[in-house]
Regions:
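Conserved RNA-binding domains used in RNP assembly and mRNA/RNA metabolism
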Residues: 1-84
């Protein structure tokens, strides 16, 4: 399931997956096909990288919510293009 999240000051839409059994302070979740969103649209995140899975610490995520239908559609469009 995709989520809208605020990660280190960036608004992202991504599939979020928990990594079980991690130590405190270690990266404990995976963001898949993350894209940064704003009023102009969406771009792959992080910029300048072709990585589609980012291992991050959940403590760097300050907000988690359901994305709007518009940003969900943008996310799936970008994901489809990156999978090609």
């Amino acid at each position: 399931m995709i989520k809208l999240l605020k990660f280190d000051g960036h608004w992202l839409v991504a599939e979020v997956e928990e990594i079980p059994g991690t130590e405190l302070g270690d990266p404990d979740c995976v963001l898949k096909y993350a894209c940064e969103v704003n009023e102009d649209g969406a771009l792959p995140f992080p910029a300048y990288s072709d990585d589609t899975e980012l291992v991050v610490r959940s403590e760097n995520i300050t907000v988690i919510a359901e994305p709007s239908s518009m940003f969900s559609a943008l996310y799936y469009d970008l994901k489809d293009k990156r999978e090609e």
